[in-house]
Design a protein with these regions (language model features):
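Beta-rich carbohydrate-recognition and catalytic domains
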Residues: 1-68, 77-143, 157-189
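Short glycine-rich, acidic/polar surface loops and turns
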Residues: 138-140, 148-152
């Protein structure tokens, strides 16, 4: 599923699909993030709200890096603190609605933490992207506003490999080694 993020966990050093309350759980959506459950990974039932409409997990926020859209990225991960969902956020091009610290129209990566017992309940959401277009190859090509569009996440040999599209022109990988301290990105004011 291009815009779907099924919940996984780490088991014996590998990322595997896991169930939440006896069902597989998937976050999905290309403007806002919704959710669905399945017994068999083939047939999915969207989660609806009290009005019988799609229940929203997150949606775009004015004046934030994800002001134009929020779209699911790689598989979500069940941790001891909750479910971590990485997502793609697009900044508005309209100056009154966008986050002016980042390029208008840029795609950046955000993350939320949801309650593992209530996966629709957001416990935390980053107000700034954890990954944004900074390298020249992420800001040239077909999408010059800048794009890091995260799609794949692999846990391999105790490191995380995050595969992403760069300016809609190539694919790259960012590697995170939890054993090494790395300085954080200095977000502009």
């Amino acid at each position: 599923c291009k815009s779907g993020s099924m919940v996984t966990t780490i088991k014996d050093g590998k990322q595997v699909l896991t169930k939440i309350d006896g069902k597989y759980f998937m976050y999905w959506g290309e403007h806002a993030v919704y959710a669905a459950t399945s017994d068999d990974l083939v047939n999915w039932t969207p989660i609806l709200d009290e009005k019988n409409e799609l229940a929203t997990v997150i949606k775009p926020r004015p004046q934030y890096f994800d002001s134009a859209l929020t779209e699911c990225g790689p598989p979500a991960i069940l941790t001891d603190k909750g479910i971590v969902l990485l997502y793609n956020g697009k900044n508005q091009t309209n100056d009154s609605k966008r986050d002016k610290r980042f390029t208008a129209g840029a795609y950046c990566a955000g993350q939320i933490l949801t309650d593992p017992k209530e996966p629709m309940k957001v416990l935390q959401r980053l107000d700034v992207p954890f990954f944004r277009p900074m390298a020249s190859f992420e800001k040239s090509g077909q999408y010059v506003d800048g794009t890091v569009f995260i799609e794949g996440l692999v846990f391999f040999k105790n490191k995380w490999y995050l595969y992403y599209g760069c300016a809609d022109s190539q694919v790259s990988v960012a590697i995170y080694d939890p054993a090494k301290k790395t300085p954080g990105d200095q977000i502009p004011n």
